[in-house]
């Protein structure tokens, strides 16, 4: 797999990971806890009491409390109290929303805003009209005890809803995938949640028998139709949908785990090496006529694919030319403790193209007929020189592969089908992980966060398959195995001669 394909694949996973990161909030406070107490009266009015804890991470002027309003609804008899700071407040009607702007100060003169590290408790109490709906057959309370208008996560929530009568009611907590818990106790509906994320909500919905309300309900909405069965059907449909989504999510989780076995199957089928009875009887002699760079191309390693050359191929070719007398090596004292090594070109007769190209690269750093490694090192510190060397080195590697390892020759030494299958699996895994991850983020269901984690894990497996060296997924042929063993034995025979 070439570098561009790998880079594209890694870019996909980066986009996926960035898409699931939370957006940085502009607010400078957190909300560790909230307590909400709601009283439903016989005339349809509800009274809301809120106790909200704030922790400020920097200095601040105050906070907002936005109360969304639907048609004909209104907030009345508002009272505000603050512990932990001096305060003022202002009510702003924004059309469809009542905004309560609470200014916070750390001095009685109300001239200095609060500082970082301040903990404040805000109390709000107000009457809310036309929230309860009265139908022909039943009354309904549908109220968000914590709404989705908040721009900060809530650490923990406790809420209680008190109805006119102690009789247990039919009730539901929405959304159906919410982790909030509810129970009926002493005629009250108790709700708790270990946290509500920004943009999420916790809603209570209850059917109230008409006999619990007075004959006159001026503070309720009156709707001339039967709605009890419709509400029950709607809630059941939502619950059934969530059950289905959660089941599908669990199946997808198991499927992603099962698919992780495919790379192991590919390795088992295509990556295991053939057994040989090779014995290095002649290890005291150079046992192969293949160029050192050829053997290097057949060798794998961390981050190195079979068939690619690295700097060791370049170095081994230099050593081979020295041993064959084509290059000479010399040194002279640089200081009392160090020496400078030089190469000299003795002959280029009979050299192969890749060897002549190597000599030409070295001659770029020739001074007075000697190739100085110290001078070469100094030159490569300059960006232009380093880039020029890298380009010539890359051309040298590619020309060698074209001459000695064209595809039909390479296939005689290495079977890369398994490596190709690893690449295909990696691409497919990334695409599937992105799809599953995106769906688990944007389609809410119980366990969606777990499915997102499985998608991330599966994407990591896909990336690993894309970047792993080809020697893991592929395998040497018998000819390649023997050639590689011969080449490794011959490395010990290469010595620099003077």
Residue ranges, per PLM feature:
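Acidic, Ser/Thr/Pro-rich intrinsically disordered cytosolic tails and loops
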Residues: 2-9, 22, 26-498
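Bacterial N-terminal signal peptides
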Residues: 10-19
């Amino acid at each position: 797999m070439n570098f561009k394909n790998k880079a594209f694949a890694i870019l996909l996973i980066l986009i996926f990971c960035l898409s699931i990161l939370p957006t940085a909030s502009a607010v400078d406070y957190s909300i560790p806890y909230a307590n909400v107490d709601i009283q439903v009266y016989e005339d349809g009015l509800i009274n809301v009491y809120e106790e909200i804890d704030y922790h400020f991470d920097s200095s601040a002027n105050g906070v907002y409390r936005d109360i969304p309003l639907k048609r004909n609804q209104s907030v009345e008899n508002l009272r505000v109290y603050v512990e932990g700071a001096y305060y003022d407040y202002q009510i702003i009607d924004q059309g469809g929303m009542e905004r309560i702007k609470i200014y916070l100060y750390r001095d009685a003169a109300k001239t200095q805003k609060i500082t970082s590290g301040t903990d404040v408790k805000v109390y709000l109490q107000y009457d809310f009209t036309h929230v309860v709906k009265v139908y022909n057959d039943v009354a309904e309370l549908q109220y968000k005890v914590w709404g989705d208008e908040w721009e900060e996560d809530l650490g923990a929530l406790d809420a209680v809803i008190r109805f006119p009568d102690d009789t247990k009611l039919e009730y539901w907590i929405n959304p159906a995938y919410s982790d909030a818990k509810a129970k009926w106790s002493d005629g009250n509906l108790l709700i708790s949640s270990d946290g509500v994320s920004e943009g999420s909500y916790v809603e209570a919905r209850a059917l109230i028998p008409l006999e619990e309300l007075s004959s006159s309900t001026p503070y309720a909405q009156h709707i001339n139709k039967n709605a009890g069965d419709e509400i029950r059907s709607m809630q059941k449909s939502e619950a059934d949908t969530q059950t289905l989504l959660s089941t599908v999510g669990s199946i997808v989780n198991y499927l992603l785990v099962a698919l992780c076995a495919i790379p192991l199957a590919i390795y088992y089928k295509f990556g295991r090496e053939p057994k040989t009875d090779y014995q290095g009887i002649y290890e005291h002699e150079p046992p192969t006529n293949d160029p050192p760079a050829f053997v290097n191309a057949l060798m794998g390693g961390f981050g190195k694919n079979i068939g690619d050359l690295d700097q060791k191929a370049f170095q081994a070719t230099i050593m081979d030319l020295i041993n064959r007398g084509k290059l000479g090596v010399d040194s002279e004292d640089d200081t009392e403790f160090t020496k400078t090594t030089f190469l000299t070109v003795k002959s280029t007769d009979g050299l192969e193209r890749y060897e002549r190209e190597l000599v030409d690269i070295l001659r770029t750093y020739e001074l007075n007929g000697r190739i100085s490694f110290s001078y070469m090192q100094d030159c490569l510190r300059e960006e232009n020189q380093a880039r020029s060397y890298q380009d010539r080195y890359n051309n040298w590697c590619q020309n060698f592969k074209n001459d000695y390892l064209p595809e039909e020759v390479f296939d005689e030494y290495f079977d890369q089908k398994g490596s190709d299958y690893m690449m295909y699996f990696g691409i497919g895994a990334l695409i599937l992980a992105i799809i599953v991850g995106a769906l688990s983020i944007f389609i809410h269901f119980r366990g969606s966060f777990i499915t997102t984690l499985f998608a991330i894990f599966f994407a990591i497996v896909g990336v690993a398959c894309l970047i792993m060296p080809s020697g893991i997924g592929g395998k040497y042929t018998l000819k390649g195995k023997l050639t590689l063993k011969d080449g490794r034995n011959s490395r010990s025979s290469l010595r620099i001669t003077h």
